[in-house]
């Protein structure tokens, strides 16, 4: 039995997110699994590191799957790319140890949200950026972005589960290692770049919506700690559209730090 790690890039515009859905809805996971079924004649479950939402793109999504196929990782990669639409590509594949788990062993994820600032949106970036040509105080947005670094309760920046009890029980604490606004004047763009251990659903898009409110002057930089403390999602900015969001990549520990080691550490913590 092989355990194969793959790195995937995709344009999320035509897909209903990462996670497989029954019926005819096209998803990234479903597309990958269908290609593998045709290649191996096996019913293979692909485990993704991040469950990106509908319309969200990826430059370096990571997943893994187990197969009895005798094909090498590179042969599987070529065969999958030949069967899938050009909007999804396996850009790297390798055979890893049986203990590797793409989701649970990830140490950090990096996301990038692109905002196009030009007056006219070029057709070739349509569906890949948020278009906002109006005035923004980008310096204030940069200062506000830095407020998200460190460990915080992100209750004000997450989607509701739909259940008040479940919302109360969720662990909303997250650690953010990097949070900044990056300017790209040559392409009339700014981007929000964030790197952290893990993220809540809609968290990045809620942060971007809040930073835009700062840029418009509706929020002040000093409002960010107040919004954190309130633990009330109605006080943060709107959830921006998905098309500007990219999963840039994931980071993993040394291969010797295995899935079995991770589970042992979890048990030790109780």
Question: Which residues does each PLM region occupy?
Answer:
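Structured-RNA-binding interfaces characteristic of tRNA pseudouridine synthases
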Residues: 1-270
């Amino acid at each position: 039995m092989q355990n194969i790690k793959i790195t995937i890039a995709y344009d999320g515009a035509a897909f209903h997110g990462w996670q497989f859905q029954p019926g005819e809805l096209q998803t990234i996971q479903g597309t990958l699994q269908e290609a593998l079924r045709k290649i191996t004649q096996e019913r293979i479950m692909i485990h993704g590191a991040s469950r990106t939402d509908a319309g969200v793109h990826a430059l370096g999504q990571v997943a893994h799957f187990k197969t009895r196929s005798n094909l090498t990782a590179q042969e599987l990669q070529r065969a999958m790319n030949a069967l899938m639409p050009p909007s999804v590509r396996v850009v790297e594949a390798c055979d890893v140890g049986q203990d590797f788990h793409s989701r649970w062993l990830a140490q950090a994820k990096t996301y990038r949200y692109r905002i196009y600032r030009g007056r006219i949106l070029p057709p070739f970036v349509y569906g890949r950026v948020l278009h906002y040509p109006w005035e923004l105080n980008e310096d204030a947005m940069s200062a506000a972005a830095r407020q998200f670094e460190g460990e915080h309760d992100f209750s004000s920046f997450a989607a509701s589960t739909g259940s008040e009890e479940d919302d109360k029980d969720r662990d909303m604490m997250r650690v953010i290692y990097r949070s900044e606004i990056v300017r790209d004047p040559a392409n009339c763009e700014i981007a929000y770049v964030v790197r952290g251990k893990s993220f809540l659903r809609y968290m990045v898009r809620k942060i971007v919506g809040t930073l835009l409110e700062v840029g418009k002057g509706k929020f002040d930089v000093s409002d960010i700690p107040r919004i954190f403390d309130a633990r009330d999602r109605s006080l943060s900015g709107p959830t921006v559209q998905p098309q500007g969001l990219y999963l840039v990549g994931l980071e993993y520990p040394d291969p010797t730090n295995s899935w079995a080691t991770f589970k042992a550490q979890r048990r030790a913590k109780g």
